[in-house]
Swiss-Prot record:
It holds the Pfam family SPOUT_MTase. S-adenosyl-L-methionine binds at residues 73, 104, 123-128. This is Ribosomal RNA large subunit methyltransferase H. Homodimer. It comes from Ralstonia nicotianae (strain ATCC BAA-1114 / GMI1000). It is found in: Cytoplasm. The gene is rlmH. GO terms for cellular component: cytoplasm. InterPro entries: Alpha/beta_knot_MTases (IPR029028), RlmH-like (IPR003742), tRNA_m1G_MTases_N (IPR029026). Its EC number is 2.1.1.177. Specifically methylates the pseudouridine at position 1915 (m3Psi1915) in 23S rRNA.
């Protein structure tokens, strides 16, 4: 099973890349994390936020593996504890197939893409920089995995 993080945005600061890479390399080979960056659409006077989100959604869809489980990050998504994320990860592994976790652009995710998602999830009630979300998501996935393995990384 592969965890694929599909994130709108590119040219992240080095510390974001390093933070993401640190947690991605900690994952076991059978549960690796891959990042696919989606070039954001430029907003102009003639393009509405809805148009931008639709164009980005088409790029996101093209990056998704066929038949993958889609988890869209959204401010109105389900607020999970780390233990609940560990339970979800266990379920995803049991069901098999890849899981794509989608981080939208500055305007968010297209409503049609969110409707297609198997799950809407939020990392925090706080507004976070999109680059930071990559690092936090990778860390939480590693922490969730560590819970499933009784690894000492996560202490209650």
């Amino acid at each position: 099973m592969q965890l694929l993080i599909v994130a709108v945005g590119h040219k992240m600061p080095r510390w974001i890349e390093d933070g993401f890479a640190e947690y991605a390399k900690r994952m076991p080979p059978e549960l690796r994390i891959e990042l696919r960056e989606i070039k954001p659409e430029q907003r102009s006077g003639s393009r509405t936020a809805a148009t931008v989100m639709q164009l980005e959604a088409a790029r996101i869809e093209a990056a998704l593996p066929k038949g993958c489980r889609i988890v869209a990050l959204d401010e109105r998504g389900k607020d999970l504890t780390t233990a609940a994320l560990a339970d979800a990860l266990t379920g995803w592994q049991r069901e098999g197939g890849d899981v794509a976790l989608i981080i939208g652009g500055a305007d968010g995710l297209d409503p049609a893409l969110k409707a297609r998602a198997h799950m809407l999830m939020r990392l925090s009630s706080l507004t976070l920089p999109h680059g930071m979300v990559r690092v936090l998501l990778a860390e939480q996935l590693y922490r969730a995995w560590s819970i499933t393995q009784n690894h000492p990384y996560h202490r209650v």
